[in-house]
Amino acid sequence: MSAPRLIARHYHGHPHDESPRDCVVLDYDARFLRRKVLTCESGERLLVDLSHTTSLDHDGVLLLEGGGEIRVVAAPEPLLEVTADHLPRMAWHIGNRHTPCQIEASRLLIQRDHVIRAMLEQLGAQLREVEEPFTPEGGAYGHGRTHAHEHGHTNHHGQHHDHADHGHSHDHSHDQ
């Protein structure tokens, strides 16, 4: 197989281009990477070669060498929907086990896990298996997931960053 023609060495949590060149559809686990060849929705192969392991968010973009963006899309995956009369209590127990959790007003979404499922059932939660995109909270410091308990800076949400090293400039703020 030939080498990928598309190469991305930088990532941003939000798009800069109104119409990205292509997109990659990845589940939660596949969106945590440093170097990997991915297949775009069009079938084109993309080499992602980031400087450090990064958690790619839904609607983030990989910046192509030579210009252009590849949009990241969260793929549907098997999840467990959690509802309860005391949803904050369920969220606390899930968080206490360092389990990634998507928090919504009337429900929580977590990856399917029989141990966590048994705990939640014992606590009185109502559980339903669903298949949806998974976009859990980024953690206490807002930097997404890391290996082990690293507390270093992993992305640039809401912080100033230089664009000189990835082929485009801005006249707008990155504040959200």
Swiss-Prot record:
Keyword Cytoplasm: yes
GO MF entry, a single one: nickel cation binding
Biased composition (Basic and acidic residues): 161-176
GO biological process: protein folding; protein-containing complex assembly; urea metabolic process
SUPFAM superfamilies: Urease metallochaperone UreE, C-terminal domain, Urease metallochaperone UreE, N-terminal domain
InterPro entries linked to this entry: UreE, UreE_C_dom, UreE_N, UreE_N_sf
Annotated region (Disordered), positions in chain: 134-176
Subcellular location: Cytoplasm
Similarity field: Belongs to the UreE family.
HAMAP family per record: UreE
Task performed by this protein: Involved in urease metallocenter assembly. Binds nickel. Probably functions as a nickel donor during metallocenter assembly.
Protein name as annotated: Urease accessory protein UreE
Organism in which the protein naturally occurs: Ruegeria sp. (strain TM1040)
